[in-house]
């Protein structure tokens, strides 16, 4: 049996990890993207403007990590959205639809007690490298 390859994905175009974890890990063709806050990669600080701007930045960060792995948002098969306030669900959905426009990935959304750096939204994703064909069952 051949062993699977595990590769760390990293880019300066997304914020550096703020703890002992990688931006993303690639195993075989599956990319596990760590939760992204609405942090500006240059400053390491949350972007101003509230949950909408934080969601845009978090998804932009995910997009940069996907690019570093040779992928884009069409490769995402699962996302998890963590919200400091579940009342922001609709506002974040409006932003989310700007990045995922068709063949939406599976997703879960949860309200949590708190997020790092006082963030209002954190998004993580799982993607699969390579061309994907969408088929209906």
From Swiss-Prot:
Modification Phosphothreonine occurs at: 74
Pfam families: Ribonuc_L-PSP (PF01042)
InterPro entries hit by this protein: RidA, RidA_CS, RutC-like_sf, YjgF/YER057c/UK114
One function term, GO molecular function aspect: 2-iminobutanoate deaminase activity
Origin superkingdom: Eukaryota
Cellular compartments per GO CC: cytosol; mitochondrial matrix; nucleus; peroxisome
Tissue expression remark: Expressed by various malignant neoplasms.
Any one of the GO BP annotations: negative regulation of translation
Residues in coiled coil: none
Positions of modified residues (N6-succinyllysine): 13, 67
Cited Gene3D superfamilies: RutC-like (3.30.1330.40)
EC numbers on record: 3.5.99.10, 3.1.-.-
In-chain residues carrying the UniProt-annotated modification Phosphoserine: 136
SUPFAM superfamilies, per database record: YjgF-like
UniProt subcellular location: Cytoplasm; Nucleus; Peroxisome; Mitochondrion
Catalytic activity line of the entry: 2-iminobutanoate + H2O = 2-oxobutanoate + NH4(+); 2-iminopropanoate + H2O = pyruvate + NH4(+)
Keywords assigned by UniProt, alphabetized: Acetylation, Cytoplasm, Hydrolase, Lipid metabolism, Mitochondrion, Nucleus, Peroxisome, Phosphoprotein, RNA-binding
Residue list for modification N-acetylserine: 2
Entry function: Catalyzes the hydrolytic deamination of enamine/imine intermediates that form during the course of normal metabolism. May facilitate the release of ammonia from these potentially toxic reactive metabolites, reducing their impact on cellular components. It may act on enamine/imine intermediates formed by several types of pyridoxal-5'-phosphate-dependent dehydratases including L-threonine dehydratase.
Summary of subunit composition and partner proteins: Homotrimer. Interacts with YTHDF2.
Homology family: Belongs to the RutC family.
Protein name: 2-iminobutanoate/2-iminopropanoate deaminase
Gene that this sequence comes from: RIDA
């Amino acid at each position: 049996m051949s062993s699977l390859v595990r590769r760390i994905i990293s880019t300066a175009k997304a914020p550096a990890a703020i703890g002992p974890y990688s931006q993303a890990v690639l195993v075989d063709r599956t990319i596990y993207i760590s939760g992204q806050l609405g942090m500006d990669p240059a400053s390491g600080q949350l972007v101003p403007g509230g949950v909408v701007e934080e969601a845009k930045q978090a998804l932009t960060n995910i997009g940069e990590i996907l690019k570093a792995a040779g992928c884009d948002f069409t490769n995402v098969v699962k996302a998890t959205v963590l919200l400091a306030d579940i009342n922001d669900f609709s506002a974040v959905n409006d932003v989310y639809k700007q990045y995922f426009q068709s063949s939406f990935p599976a997703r879960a959304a949860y309200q949590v007690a708190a997020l790092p750096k006082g963030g209002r939204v954190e998004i993580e994703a799982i993607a699969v490298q390579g061309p994907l064909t969408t088929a209906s069952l």
